[in-house]
Regions:
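Glycine/proline-enriched, intrinsically flexible loops and inter-domain linkers
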Residues: 1-317
Length: 317
């Protein structure tokens, strides 16, 4: 409905642009030009996207090369090491969970509704059960999916849960599949965190951001020094676009993260001017912005005073 952007009133996935399934872009060490053309023909800045894709493919190819070199050197020991690293992460997570008091811990957060069709806040409910050395996250009671683009695809819900577990369990635990093995997730089909097709999902990050907030709220009683209060709970961005250099048919598209800051804990202030939870992105420096986008001039860019929650430790600005 809104080319190149997300329509706030999209009521179907088919209104949000072309759908591209998982397809090969390279095969037998050769680029598949038709697939690249499909991607580039659907963007206003094909040169930028081609550069991005080429860089990602090159990085992956180097990664493949390094793994092959390591395997030729170490053989089956390398694979055994990889398996042990996954098992180690699982043991570490389960060891932490085993120290927690068994029980059920619940919390409800809310995401803003969408326009006149959904004026009321939508609940995201989670009940977390600690049983022995495993965790179960149950989203029963969460709002039903809606005909608006903030539904969260189930893989994103899983990612939000696993992010939250990793954040609470310790930053020295290797991030891999082992963390996930200690976690069970229940998300009823048709709710806003496990929608069915063709529910729109273009702005899902604004709802997905609330999932860690709900989880941290539920687990705060047993992680008092680690869990943080809610941040701005959204992915706030600015998109500017326009004509490029005079005398050319080029265009520019500038997408900037305008972060709202993170929540505080009982032992430290919240971070200011950064995205947290599911985005963790930083802003683009003004100098780099003005050099790359010559039609953009920043007059002022600063933190707004007194926008963090007050307290002994304040929220981020």
């Amino acid at each position: 409905k809104v080319p190149g952007s997300t329509s706030g009133d999209a009521d179907s996935l088919f209104q949000e642009g072309i759908r591209i399934p998982v397809i090969r872009i390279r095969e037998r060490d050769q680029l598949i030009p038709s697939v690249l053309d499909l991607l580039l023909d659907n963007t206003r800045v094909p040169q930028e996207r081609e550069g991005d894709l080429t860089a990602q493919m090159s990085a992956n190819l180097i990664g493949v090369q390094r793994i092959q070199e390591a395997y030729r050197r170490y053989g089956d020991d390398l694979e055994a090491c990889m398996k042990e690293l996954v098992a180690y992460s699982e043991r570490r997570v389960r060891a932490v969970v085993a120290t927690l008091p068994d029980g059920e811990y619940s919390y409800t957060d809310y995401v803003d509704g969408c326009g006149d069709k959904y004026p009321d806040p939508l609940p995201i409910r989670v009940k977390i059960t600690v049983a022995g050395d495993s965790l179960t996250f149950d989203f029963t009671g969460t709002a039903q999916q809606i005909k608006a683009p903030i539904n969260v695809p189930y893989p994103c819900t899983k990612a939000a849960v696993f992010f939250s577990v990793k954040a609470l369990m310790g930053d020295d635990i290797p991030a891999n599949e082992g963390i996930n093995r200690a976690v069970n997730i229940i998300a009823p089909k048709g709710c806003i965190v496990n929608p069915t097709e063709p529910s729109p999902i273009g702005a899902q990050i604004d709802c997905c951001q609330r999932i860690p907030d709900a989880i941290f709220g539920a687990l705060a009683p047993i992680f008092p020094d680690t869990a943080v209060t809610a941040g701005n709970g959204a992915c706030t961005t600015t998109i500017l676009a326009g004509e490029g250099a005079i005398g050319t048919d080029s265009v520019f598209i500038f997408h900037e993260v305008i972060a709202g800051g993170g929540g505080a804990s009982r032992i430290f202030d919240g971070l200011s001017g950064v995205q947290v939870n599911m985005t963790n992105t930083s802003n683009m420096p003004i100098e780099a912005t003005e050099m790359e986008f010559t039609k953009i001039l920043a007059r002022k860019y600063e933190l707004k005073e007194d926008t963090g929650g007050a307290g002994q430790f304040r929220g981020g600005l």
